[in-house]
Regions:
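Transmembrane alpha-helices
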Residues: 49-54, 176-180, 186-188, 201-230
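Transmembrane alpha-helix signature in integral membrane proteins
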Residues: 62, 86-119
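C-terminal transmembrane helix and the adjacent membrane-cytosol boundary/short C-terminal tail
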Residues: 1-28, 38-41, 124, 180-191, ...
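Membrane-interfacial helix termini and adjacent extracytoplasmic/periplasmic loops
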Residues: 23-25, 29, 67-68, 75, ...
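Loop-to-helix entry region at the N-terminal start of transmembrane alpha-helices
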Residues: 87-94, 152-172, 216, 221, ...
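Non-cytoplasmic
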Residues: 57-65, 175, 217-251
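Interhelical loop and adjacent transmembrane-helix boundary motif
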Residues: 30-35, 78-87, 228-281, 291
Length: 291
């Protein structure tokens, strides 16, 4: 008989727990004291560390003064963002265009690759999954240098397409691994049941497999969009004239001082990210309830 080591460990720990009433009270008192003295402190400090810089950006986006002294509330920087920032909007458009296009391609390729790895058995399957981790552990400088050398070798001009190709290659392993983790939880006997009921391979794919792994596909797509939008190092190496993205544009502005217009744009992007996140969460919740 095969024994689950984790289940055996849990059973052993349960047996080793003190059963007396004083021991239970002592354990609960210790957990309560440690929870509020250490865990809560760490949680609060972590949240402050994460969200305080964002709060500062939001506050200074409404500052009437260009400097660090807060002199009053004003919407002047949002007006400048809307009407006097053509280059900034162009760089944002380039970033969004590259992010969504590279995320779409990497999601399609990653989904097909994950399905192929899970469905078929062949030699070297384990090595492919291991190699997929390399872009996650390699420094982006190495990836950027190797990518620009490869593009130079094949005579590919640097521009928006080179950034798109580099971001697709960089995001593909992340999407592949996220979808693969979702597929590993899928029961393929459902597909066999669909075949027995007369479904074709296309119907089984579109009506059984894809709906089951849709949360993983959407998560991989959003991860790819986020990674593409925030990437600076790889984009710095493979960009060319007329292909400035938002991170490159912000970097060029920081060299001459941070403009409050960037703060206004940051708040708009934070607000958009929050709305997309909650909308996606509600969609996945309704999708799970519908199933």
């Amino acid at each position: 008989m095969i024994v689950n080591p984790f289940r055996a460990l849990v059973s052993r720990l349960n047996k080793s727990r003190p059963r007396s009433e004083p021991a239970r009270h002592a354990r609960r008192a210790f957990q309560k004291r440690s929870r509020f003295s250490f865990s809560l402190t760490v949680l609060v400090l972590t949240l402050v560390f994460l969200f305080l810089p964002l709060f500062v950006i939001v506050v200074y986006s409404f500052n009437a003064n260009k400097g660090s002294d807060f002199t009053g509330v004003s919407l002047v920087w949002y007006k400048a963002l809307l009407f006097d920032s053509k280059n900034l909007w162009r760089s944002l458009f380039n970033s969004l265009l590259i992010a969504f296009s590279s995320a779409a391609v990497s999601t399609v390729l990653g989904t097909l690759a994950a399905l192929g790895i899970s469905w078929y058995k062949f030699k070297g399957k384990t090595y492919i999954q291991t190699i997929s981790f390399l872009p996650m552990v390699l420094p982006e400088v190495i990836i950027g240098v190797s990518t620009v050398i490869f593009f130079s070798g094949i005579k590919l001009p640097l521009g928006l397409f080179s950034i798109f190709a580099a971001h697709t290659t960089f995001c593909l392993p992340f999407v592949f691994l996220m979808i693969l983790a979702r597929i590993d939880e899928f029961d393929f006997s459902i597909v066999e049941a669909a075949y027995d009921l007369g479904a074709t391979e296309r119907q089984a794919m579109l009506k059984v497999i894809v709906p089951a792994i849709l949360p993983g596909i959407l998560s991989g797509f959003l991860m790819a969009v986020t990674m593409s939008l925030e990437d600076f190092v790889i984009t710095f190496f493979v960009s060319g004239p007329g292909s400035t993205t938002l991170p490159l544009y912000v970097y060029s502005m920081i060299r001459f001082g941070v403009s409050p217009v960037i703060n206004a744009l940051s708040f708009v992007m934070i607000l958009g990210t929050v709305l997309i996140t909650f909308s996606m969460r509600k969609f996945l919740k309704n999708f799970a309830a519908a199933k």
